[in-house]
Amino acid sequence: MRRELLLEKIETYKAIMPWYVLDYYQSKLAVPYSFTTLYEYLKEYKRFFDWLMDADLTKVPKIADIDLSTLEHLTKKDLEAFVLYLRERPSLNTYSTKEGLSQTTINRTLSALSSLYKYLTEEVENDQGEPYFYRNVMKKVSTKKKKETLASRAENIKQKLFLGDETLAFLDYVDKEYEQKLSNRAKSSFRKNKERDLAIIALLLASGVRLSEAVNLDLKDVNLNMMIIEVIRKGGKRDSVNVAGFAKGYLESYLAVRQRRYKAEKQDLAFFLTEYRGVPNRMDASSIEKMVGKYSEDFKIRVTPHKLRHTLATRLYDATKSQVLVSHQLGHSSTQVTDLYTHIVNDEQKNALDNL
């Protein structure tokens, strides 16, 4: 979604929200939470508030009138009824005949509500320096996580990684072969964005940054001499990230055409730009996802930018055997989340031994 459209949608949701949700939004914007995250949270709050009114748990005529007392006095049974509603309601805006939302979507909804309740009961201060209320019913609501062993997850992910020589082969394919299959009209569009697209893919493969971190990069955040970029991690922490040397040429080629190709002026701070009707804009997450999916599907298998992050992490662990180093590269505070890469690498080693 383009940034301008995203901000428009956010304003639409803000216009119907209670005052305390607007306080929450302002507080999290200062962290900073990304606009994408806040947009998703606002959608979840609307879903929840709509249900409160439909279930007669509040007698007000519109969402903006739902008061703090309503949230304070909701019971565990009320929230469990909401979860059951989510699990059984028909999916909207889809051709699927499947009843109910996925567990992943339900967990996302509950996560958004937990964040709001934590803000209202712990983080915010009223005139007396106290939170708005103390009872956090969300602490009593359990979430169900998908059960899957690390070995099983590693096996599923491994097929979607560009390991070994495939990392550079993927870049080389986009650079030299992809164009050959295109019509003359499609070639024109491809050539316009070729350097930018290659720079994005190379950066993801060479640094392992999250999609949101790549989207939010500004020119000042990129140091090609040191091959270091500055990013805002989850939770608003600023971090310096090393970038593998193979990405340097692609990034330099993009920078050489960025100003002329995308009509960038001094006020256009975003590193990765797109141009629409002569106006440069920051490239958004959905456009990058589609771009990565398009090229990767033609090369081998359709993947997301997050799989390129997994690719970097797996290759780095394979080269160093250090979970601590991989955790630091990815911006994780613990090595627990990097256990996945040990399973992938160990499986690769076993396959290599079997072929001896």
Curated annotation (Swiss-Prot):
GO terms for molecular function: DNA binding; tyrosine-based site-specific recombinase activity. Keywords: Cell cycle, Cell division, Chromosome partition, Cytoplasm, DNA integration, DNA recombination, DNA-binding. It holds the Pfam family Phage_int_SAM_1. It is found in: Cytoplasm. Transmembrane segments: none annotated. Residues 16-121 form the Core-binding (CB) domain. PROSITE patterns: CB (PS51900), TYR_RECOMBINASE (PS51898). One of its GO terms (cellular component) is cytoplasm. FtsK is required for recombination. One of its GO terms (biological process) is cell division. PANTHER family: PHAGE INTEGRASE-RELATED (PTHR30349), TYROSINE RECOMBINASE XERC (PTHR30349:SF77). NCBIfam families: PRK05084.1. This is Tyrosine recombinase XerS. It comes from Streptococcus pyogenes serotype M2 (strain MGAS10270). The gene is xerS.
